[in-house]
């Protein structure tokens, strides 16, 4: 069956969901600043792991918009928060509404974000003191890949985001999503770096505070191809793509939210 048909069939029966194994090692207690011990800070820290308030005008415009929204809302009411780049900001509205609106989710995605940009804006107010969600979902790093970031540096940037969240809200559990596939087929050069980043960040999962999911394979056919029915430009998802993504991570989200 063509992936496009499979996606449409899924849309007709979203309630079924898709299973996806949780990554990581054995559960263990974890202090906030010991998150992601397999990716410790380095000296000097690479650019991808150093907070940087990006200069790109569109990014700054969206950041300013979020500044206003955060100031105008009671962020203590947010039970879930989504953090990341355009793949988060652009979560298809009807799919987002179906899966997350009833959970009090806040979308803090910013198109064009990098790991270092996310770190900077979290430190500058996008994680206010009142924000204590039960779950933070993190998807960031694909722009670092596109602009030549090295897998180990990008993974460290993601780990720094995790450590920041843990330091601000130790009770918040974090679901790291593996970077999604890019390009039409498995020969796309960036896929190798994506695989390397995902292998590194998967090791952050401790199954108690930090969790990992890799929904990317759900978007591909048996030959590793990414249909334009799923990602209209080889990266950004269509409604069908977001349906697959949301259904794919739903079992983990339910499991995490059910934890005491």
Range-by-range predicted roles:
Residues 55-58, 75-78, 116-152, 237-260:
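N-terminal/domain-start segments enriched in small and hydrophobic, helix-friendly residues
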Residues 1-82, 88-94, 98, 255-260:
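N-terminal secretory targeting modules
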Residues 89-101, 116-159, 164, 175, ...:
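Oxyanion-hole/transition-state-stabilizing segment in secreted/luminal serine hydrolases
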Residues 73-77, 98-100, 128-132, 167-169, ...:
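Extracellular/periplasmic catalytic domains that process cell-envelope and extracellular macromolecules
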Residues 47-56, 107-117, 146, 234:
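Acidic/histidine-rich helix-loop elements
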Residues 79-82, 104-109, 135-140, 144, ...:
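Structural recognition of the beta-strand scaffold that forms the well-ordered cores
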Residues 82, 113, 117, 149, ...:
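Extracytoplasmic/secreted proteins, especially bacterial periplasmic and envelope-associated proteins
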Residues 181-260:
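Catalytic His-Asp segment of secreted/periplasmic serine-dependent ester chemistry enzymes
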């Amino acid at each position: 069956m063509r992936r496009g048909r499979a996606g449409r069939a899924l849309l007709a029966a979203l309630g079924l969901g898709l299973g996806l194994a949780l990554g990581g090692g054995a559960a263990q207690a974890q202090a906030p600043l010991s998150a992601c011990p397999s990716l410790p800070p380095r000296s000097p820290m690479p650019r991808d792991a150093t907070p940087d308030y990006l200069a790109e005008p569109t990014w700054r415009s969206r950041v300013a918009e979020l500044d206003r929204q955060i100031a105008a809302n009671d962020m203590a009411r947010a039970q879930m928060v989504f953090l990341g780049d355009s793949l988060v900001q652009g979560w298809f509205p009807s799919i987002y509404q179906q899966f997350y609106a009833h959970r009090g989710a806040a979308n803090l995605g910013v198109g064009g974000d990098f790991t270092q940009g996310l770190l900077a804006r979290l430190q500058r107010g996008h994680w206010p003191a009142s924000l204590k969600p039960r779950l933070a979902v993190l998807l960031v790093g694909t722009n670092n890949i596109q602009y030549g970031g090295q897998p180990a540096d990008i993974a460290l940037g993601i780990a720094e985001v995790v450590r920041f969240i843990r330091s601000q809200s130790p009770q918040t559990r974090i679901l790291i999503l593996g970077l999604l596939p890019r390009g039409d087929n498995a020969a796309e050069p960036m896929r190798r770096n994506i695989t390397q980043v995902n292998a590194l960040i998967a090791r952050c999962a401790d199954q108690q505070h930090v969790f990992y999911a890799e929904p990317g394979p759900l978007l591909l056919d048996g030959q590793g191809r990414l249909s334009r029915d799923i990602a209209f430009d080889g990266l950004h998802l269509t409604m069908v793509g977001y349906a697959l993504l949301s259904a794919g991570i739903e079992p983990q989200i339910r499991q995490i939210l059910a934890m005491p």
